[in-house]
Curated annotation (Swiss-Prot):
GO biological process per UniProt: base-excision repair
Role summary: Endonuclease IV plays a role in DNA repair. It cleaves phosphodiester bonds at apurinic or apyrimidinic (AP) sites, generating a 3'-hydroxyl group and a 5'-terminal sugar phosphate.
Family designation: Belongs to the AP endonuclease 2 family.
Known EC number: 3.1.21.2
PROSITE patterns per the UniProt record, alphabetical: AP_NUCLEASE_F2_1 (PS00729), AP_NUCLEASE_F2_3 (PS00731), AP_NUCLEASE_F2_4 (PS51432)
Molecular-function annotations in GO: deoxyribonuclease IV (phage-T4-induced) activity; DNA binding; DNA-(apurinic or apyrimidinic site) endonuclease activity; phosphoric diester hydrolase activity; zinc ion binding
Binding positions (Zn(2+) 2): 155, 189, 226, 271
Species, as recorded: Oleidesulfovibrio alaskensis (strain ATCC BAA-1058 / DSM 17464 / G20)
Residues involved in Zn(2+) 3 binding: 192, 239, 241
Protein name: Probable endonuclease 4
Name of encoding gene: nfo
Record note on cofactor: Binds 3 Zn(2+) ions.
């Protein structure tokens, strides 16, 4: 399946949300369009189960047609939370590789270019060993999937337990250990970064964080931002999202993010609390757009 992209890149920033695929993955596109989003993240299968029905060709056709009608805005998928690329057992490793390969294959069939995944937990093996294992397993999934246009986006974490990727150097370590680093990018989650100790509220500290990301991995690898406020404090090592401007990060951090010309082209996707309708997403997107204006 060919990837879908916009012919004319918009001048405004691309802002969207993770949308439900209830009723069919194409419904997520319809929900994004109805909310006024210009970026989208989806689950292409049940994210909390190891096994899922195969993606039917009809469903793939409905999805790609919906994306074209919407305008070809960027779409990413988020891989299952069950995947642990740094698993410390052969069984856990094989299950994670097989599931990640399925995620990548589904994305390829849907024309989705980016699959976000957490780098995993090293379970006491140490960060260096965990990074090497994560790279080897993700490389294997990329080889199995048969979708050469799809990129793995490693998402930074809040550093809970033995989770890898709390630091930008930790994300870079996985990429450096890969045999195919050109297939990897980075997804920056603002709430996770804050939980891991990156203070994004102060201009100087925010700039230092982005410069650190650039030095460690290169800003050219940053393909997606998860714009989430945090219910928990700086360095809490906890992952709790809330509405933009209503958490510990506050509007100051997102004003810096939205006015950072280095990241102007990077899609910003919300993973904030939802209600029964699109109102919460529309509210949060409106806040981001407002903060982008000088």
């Amino acid at each position: 399946m060919e990837t879908i992209s916009r012919q004319n890149k918009p001048q405004q920033q691309l802002i969207g949300a993770h949308m439900s695929a209830a009723g069919g993955v194409h419904k997520a596109v319809e929900r994004a369009e109805a909310a006024g989003a210009t970026a989208l993240q989806v689950f292409t299968r049940n994210q909390r189960q190891w096994n899922a029905p195969p993606l039917e060709e009809h469903d793939a056709e409905l999805f790609t047609a919906a994306v074209r009608r919407w305008g070809g805005y960027p779409v990413s998928s988020h891989a299952s939370y069950l995947i642990n690329p740094a698993a410390d057992t052969p069984e856990g490793a094989e299950r994670s590789v097989a599931l990640m390969a399925d995620e990548l294959q589904r994305a390829g069939r849907l024309g989705i270019e980016m699959v976000v995944v957490h780098p995993g937990a090293h379970k006491g093996q140490g960060e260096a060993a965990g990074a090497a294992l994560a790279a080897a397993r993700l490389d294997e999934a990329l080889e199995r999937c048969g979708s050469p246009a799809v990129m793995v986006l490693l998402e930074n974490t809040a550093g809970q337990g033995t989770m890898l990727g709390a630091s930008f150097a930790g994300l870079a370590a996985v990429i450096e250990a890969s045999r195919m680093p050109e297939r990897y990018g980075i997804c920056l989650d603002t709430a996770h970064a804050f939980g891991a100790g990156y203070d994004l509220r102060d201009a100087a500290l925010y700039d230092a964080a982005i410069r650190e990301l650039d030095v460690c991995a290169g800003l050219d690898r940053l393909r997606l931002v998860h714009a989430n406020d945090s219910l928990t404090g700086l360095g809490s090592r906890r992952d709790r999202h809330t509405h933009i401007g209503q958490g510990e990060l506050g509007e100051a951090a997102f004003r810096l993010l939205m006015r950072d010309e280095r990241l102007h082209h990077v899609p910003k996707v919300l993973e904030t609390p939802k209600g029964k309708g699109p109102e919460e997403d529309m509210m949060n997107m409106a806040v981001l757009r407002r903060l982008a204006c000088p």
